[in-house]
Amino acid sequence: MTVRVSINGFGRIGRNILRAIIESGRDDIIVVGINDLGPVETNAHLLRYDTVHGRFPAGVKVNDDTIDVGKGPIRVTAIRDPKELLWKELDVDVAMECTGIFATRDKASQHLDAGAKRVLVSAPAAGADLTVVYGVNHQKLTKDHLVVSNASCTTNCLAPLAMIINNEVGIKQGFMTTIHSYTGDQPTLDTMHSDMYRARAAAGNMIPTSTGAAKAVGLVLPELNGKLDGVSMRVPTQNVSVVDFKFNATRPTSVEEINDIVKKASLGNLKNILGYTDEPLVSSDFNHDSHSSVFHMDQTKVMDGSFVRVLSWYDNEWGFSNRMSDTAVAISKTI
């Protein structure tokens, strides 16, 4: 079965979802509709040329209200009300909600009213039927999960790591700091913002702010609910982020054991989700890396046998966009 998906919101994540599908060559998913309030030609241009990820790897043709990237015409609309979208006409299996605006179950469920069989939100979504981190809990998807959250890029980085470590050595409590590239909701110059930290110029500051990513791990791993917390430090890089995770293990462990646990999982049941490196790499080396999380082995530290610090990189755009497709395909198997 080839799952038919639509994308509402053709921004950083929306465009990268389409690009990831085309670059992967996978044939189990196809984009049949895009809704974005920008002009079709502008959306096509931003798809062709990308400052972070480079030129689109295929031709991008515009014909009236369609974009074609080699898999047939994709219908493009500019409809404000999600209930009025053409998902029934396009026979959409999974509507991908990528605007950042309709990030609650009630708001996202308007895609169901428009004819989509399921909805996948590219952000944490209050009230979602299930929050999924692919590779960690996607097996829990059932036909009753109509509105699903794909969590956040940071939760997708931390959750696989937390799962395997908790399974092997146990986590009493842990604290995460994500050193995170700036994103589209941050200004280029100081301006008004509901978060006064994020009101400051993105490219000129290191900005401490909040994140619910660590607590959200408890939504996908109930055994860790209430045991994790975290903060975010937004930094002046345009892409790639890193999770610095410190925790108290429930039993004594070592650097070697922690690294072996991660390496084994990355070569086994978390292959293509969790990667690892023992090279002296920096953030730009992980640009366009499709893993949810890439563990940096030579950064592991253990103090007094049970206080552990680990570091894991993630391309906060590309890895997450690849997981959106993976999760959509998993959802389609429940329809």
Where are the model-predicted features located?
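Structured loop/turn residues at secondary-structure junctions
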Residues: 100, 153, 209, 250, ...
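C-terminal substrate-binding/catalytic lobe of Rossmann-fold NAD(P)-dependent oxidoreductases
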Residues: 23-86, 170-173, 178-307
